[in-house]
């Protein structure tokens, strides 16, 4: 299964987690303790919708 890895600042962590839980997306989340970046691993199909939601919320993100 293809996965998307999205990285963003930790201040958006709760908003992104709320979106993932409310839409029943299986995800894995980790936080880099040195930079404060959050990495979210989601299936490719759900990742496209997540990217659209991040754009809607104006969350700056990077694809890894």
Which ranges hold each PLM region?
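Short glycine-/aliphatic-rich beta-strand segments at the starts of folded cytosolic domains
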Residues: 1-10, 37-38
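Short, intrinsically disordered low-complexity segments
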Residues: 1-2, 23, 61
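Generic signature of intrinsically disordered, low-complexity, basic-rich segments
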Residues: 3, 14, 43-45
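Surface-exposed beta-strand edges and flanking loops
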Residues: 6-8, 31, 42, 63
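Short amphipathic alpha-helix segments
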Residues: 7-26
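Short amphipathic alpha-helices in soluble, non-transmembrane regions
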Residues: 16-22, 49-58
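Acidic, low-complexity, intrinsically disordered interaction modules
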Residues: 21-47
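Conserved short beta-strand edge segments in small beta-sheet-based binding/regulatory domains
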Residues: 28-31, 56-64
